Amino acid sequence: LLGLVLFAGFSLLACSDDKDIIDDKIELIADDEPQPVTESSGFWVVNEDWFGHDNGTVNYFRQQAPDSYEAMYRAYRVANGENEQLGVTTQFGAVWGENIYFISKQGNRLVVADAETLKKKAVLTEIGGDGRSFVGINENKGYVSHTSGIAVFDIKSFSITGQIEGASGQIGMMGLSGNHVFAVSQQNGIYVIDTETDQIVRTIAGTYSTLTISKEGDVWVAGSNGFLRIDPLSLDSEEIVYPEGAAVGSSWGAWNAGSLCASTQKNVLY
């Protein structure tokens, strides 16, 4: 199965090929006017929305032509009604298998919906801490990071079945490559977790903010002055200085998913 990550705010991640989106061909509709979701190719944008005024939202951009998209506003509320909402300050979303997972800092911290219709499947308000991110492992299991560690999520029962032992403090972005999940810890660096045993097998010390998995499977972790590239099989790593003008900023202050992602079509990072 292939997971698709969606970052909060204004970061866009397309699920088709890597083509520039031409802004003047995206016709936005008026605020607060929800539009129904149409099954078609396109991409999602998760919004933290306006803290103190509204909960998080998700918009859907449906492709009408190779360079033309139609925006569908507040799509989750359209599918489920105005009383069904995401949590407070939604910062992360991921498509895994048949579901889409929305992670928020407070309130409805984990919302699971059908990836095609956006119909609600489950809402969890307690996951062990304030929500951060989700990574799918297989058809039965995923991990949810939060401010106090990493929760193990059973996809079939939509329930938290435990916490990763030894993972403490705020955990941000996570990525699956091979048989390991790599998770960024604000305090301790990178946790390497065996997905069969749900045990931490290595901790890579350092100060890092976010990570992504490249098309060839390498783990790229953003630090203060450069990348840490990790081989997912040997777990060997090397430091690579940022190209000039391409540093990745910290995402810990008011946590967000960061400004780093990888192409699914080419072996490049954005």
Region annotations inferred by a language model:
Residues L1, V5-F43:
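Bacterial Sec-dependent N-terminal signal peptides
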Residues D24-I26, D67-Q85, K119-E126, F158-E165, ...:
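A short beta-strand motif characteristic of beta-propeller blades
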Residues L28-P34, Q85-F92, G128-E139, S168-G178, ...:
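Repeated scaffold domains used in trafficking and secretory/extracellular systems
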Residues G42-V46, N99-I103, K141-V144, H180-A183, ...:
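Conserved beta-propeller blade signature
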Residues V46-R132, G136-E139:
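Post-signal peptide N-terminal segment of secreted/secretory-pathway proteins
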Residues D49-D54, G107-R109, G149-I150, N188-G189, ...:
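Short glycine/acidic-enriched loop and turn motifs that connect beta-strands
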Residues V58-Q63, V112-D114, F153, Y191-D194, ...:
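Hydrophobic/aromatic beta-strand positions that recur at structurally equivalent sites within the blades
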Residues K120-S177:
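Asp-box/WD-like beta-propeller blade repeats and closely related beta-sheet repeat scaffolds
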